[in-house]
From Swiss-Prot:
Pathway: Metabolic intermediate biosynthesis; acetyl-CoA biosynthesis; acetyl-CoA from acetate: step 1/2
Flavoprotein recorded as keyword: no
The name this protein goes by in its record: Acetate kinase AckA
Family: Belongs to the acetokinase family.
Source organism: Salmonella typhimurium (strain LT2 / SGSC1412 / ATCC 700720)
Keyword presence, DNA damage: no
Subcellular localization: Cytoplasm
Subunit relationships: Homodimer.
Length: 400
């Protein structure tokens, strides 16, 4: 066990993902999830030394109770883990324009996260609770907490990518612009793709597709992000599990004026009742859509719209590659496992030289990386993401 152990925290509004990772070699000593916060069935599950365990946190439990449990129950089983922690890394969904890289957390950073909360109202307030609880639970690491921003990697976008064609004052005075998300994942797979393609990162032109319950595509030119599909918030872009992605903005006025829906109802519909869930009217789970594609109309409908949108984004981002596209990369829960999504999407892009090898595509699932294109055609590659490792490495580097 090295002396570079980092506790990685990802606090959501109703859950907390946690892990202890060796920032040098990536070994994971503890991983877990506390979920169903504020509900009677609040629970925590974890894996340590290869064994999986689970416990109830008590009705209504939330971040504070979860961190208490991690410190006083889980880590009490293995005190040497606590003793060797050198830093705590926090995933922060939105850093606005202020943060272009990870930073050690102090009062000004806490204020910066608060200032960006209007762009991520479900996430940033939860991150702040996580930071406050971590400072309480690990007083010996009070100056070793690091914020790693999902938006940071996208801060290299040029103005023509991040500006909306709205009154310019909305950007200058209120920060209304494209920020993107999943930046830590897009950054990680960019580094890994450079190794697999045997190219220096700064010469790499790729399109990265992080596809999970949320999804985004990024255009990476010379190793830097030049455009991404998520916008001011994570609602723009691709079809997602429950999010609509791109729509005609006037649909909102139509729903309000014609159907009498309130702003809150429309917001809920676009974020929680749309996407794959809206199209199937059954589930947000891509596995259902893939498994039933050939037999159920709802699954086929959802898959076709999903892949159509994804292919359009990949195709449009080739225009930003300065005439050279080295590869398309798939990552995230769907990107890594849904072979059908990859095959159908790239099947629409034959004009760009993509041809999927069926066997290679099926082999690159369940944590396995690999090229999925036919020999001699444009590279397409699957790379399992590892956001926790990036967070651990940044936390370790900044607190060394």
């Amino acid at each position: 066990m090295s002396s570079k152990l980092v506790l990685v925290l990802n606090c959501g509004s109703s859950s907390l993902k946690f892990a202890i990772i060796d920032a040098v070699n990536g070994d994971e000593y503890l991983s877990g999830l506390a979920e169903c916060f504020h509900l009677p069935e609040a629970r925590i599950k974890w894996k340590m030394d290869g064994s999986k365990q689970e416990a109830a946190l008590g009705a209504g439990a939330a971040h504070s109770e979860a961190l208490n449990f991690i410190v006083n129950t889980i880590l009490a089983q293995k005190p040497e883990l606590s003793a060797q922690l050198t830093a705590i890394g926090h995933r922060i969904v939105h850093g606005g324009e202020k943060y272009t890289s990870s930073v050690v957390i102090d009062e000004s950073v806490i204020q910066g996260i608060k200032d960006s909360a209007s762009f991520a109202p479900l996430h940033n307030p939860a991150h702040l609770i996580g930071i406050a609880e971590a400072l309480k639970s690990f007083p010996q690491l009070k100056d070793k907490n690091v914020a790693v921003f999902d938006t940071a990697f996208h801060q290299t976008m040029p103005e023509e990518s991040y500006l909306y064609a709205l009154p310019y004052s909305l950007y200058k005075e209120h920060g209304v612009r494209r920020y993107g998300a999943h930046g830590t994942s897009h950054f990680y797979v960019t580094q890994e793709a450079a190794k697999m393609l045997n190219k220096p990162v700064e010469e790499l032109n790729i399109i990265t597709c992080h596809l999970g319950n949320g999804g985004s595509v990024s255009a990476i030119r010379n190793g830097k992000c030049v455009d991404t599909s998520m916008g001011l918030t994570p609602l723009e872009g691709l079809v997602m599990g429950t999010r609509s992605g791109d729509i005609d903005p006037a649909i909102i006025f139509h729903l309000h004026d014609t159907l009498g829906m309130s702003v809150d109802q429309i917001n809920k519909m676009l974020t929680k009742e749309s996407g794959l869930l809206g199209l199937t009217e059954v589930t947000s789970d891509c596995r259902y859509v893939e498994d039933n594609y050939a037999t159920k109309e709802d699954a086929k409908r959802a898959m076709d719209v999903y892949c159509h949108r994804l292919a359009k984004y990949i195709g449009s981002y080739t225009a930003l590659m300065d005439g050279r596209l080295d590869a398309v990369v798939f990552t995230g829960g769907i990107g890594e496992n849904a072979a059908m999504v990859r095959e159908l999407s790239l099947g629409k892009l034959g004009v760009l030289g993509f041809e999927v090898d069926h066997e290679r595509n099926l082999a690159a699932r369940f944590g396995k990386s690999g090229f999925i294109n036919k020999e001699g055609t444009r590279p397409a590659v699957v790379i399992p993401t590892n956001e926790e490792l990036v967070i651990a490495q940044d936390a370790s580097r900044l607190t060394a």
